[in-house]
Amino acid sequence: MFHTISYTGSREKQHNQVISQLKSLIYEEPDRIANLANASALLNFYLSDINWVGFYMYDGKELVLGPFQGLPACIRIPLGKGVCGTSAKERRSVRVDDVHAFPGHIACDAASNSEIVIPVIKNGELIGILDIDSPLKSRFDEKDQAFLEQLVQVLTEQL
C-alpha cells in the first residue's frame, strides 16, 4: 500500500525518498503496465509545476503512448521527431528549457513550455521513454535529470 509522506530535507534526500517509494511500489511486481502506471503516479504526486508525466513505449518502429498522468496525449511519435522522438533515437536524455524553440517540437499540450525526456533502456535495447512537461520555462535542471535517470534505472530493473 502507498503511504503519502511529507518530503523533507535536502533535495537529494527528497529524491532518495522517492526512489525508496518506487522500489517499494515495484518490488516483486512483474507487470510492466502496473509498474509504469505507479511510477507515473508517484512522479505526478512528488514533482511540482508539471502538467504531464508518463511513458511512451517503443514498439520496434515508433513510440506509443503508455501509462501517464495528465491530459490526453499524442498517441504515436516517430523516432527522431520532437523531444521524445529525439531522446529515443539518440538514446540520451534531452532537457529543453523552452519547447517552442526546439526544432520539430510536437505540441500535445499548448500549456507546456519546458520538457525533460529520459530514455528507458534495458540490456542495450530501447524500451521507451519517460516524458515530463511543465508549464514553466526552464523547470528542469541537472539535478532533476540525474534524479530521473536514477529513477528510470531502478524502474528498468523491474521491467
Residue locations for each model-derived region?
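Short hydrophobic/aromatic beta-strand element in the GNAT-like acyltransferase core
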Residues: 52, 117, 129
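Sensory-domain boundary capping and coupling elements
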Residues: 121-134
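Intrinsically disordered, low-complexity terminal regulatory regions
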Residues: 1-66, 159
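Juxtadomain coupling helices with adjacent low-complexity linkers
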Residues: 2, 23, 134-159
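A generic structural signal for residues located within well-ordered alpha-helices
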Residues: 31-34, 79, 112, 143
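A short, aliphatic-rich beta-strand micro-motif
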Residues: 114-121
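Regulatory sensory and allosteric helical modules in signal-transduction proteins
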Residues: 50, 58-108
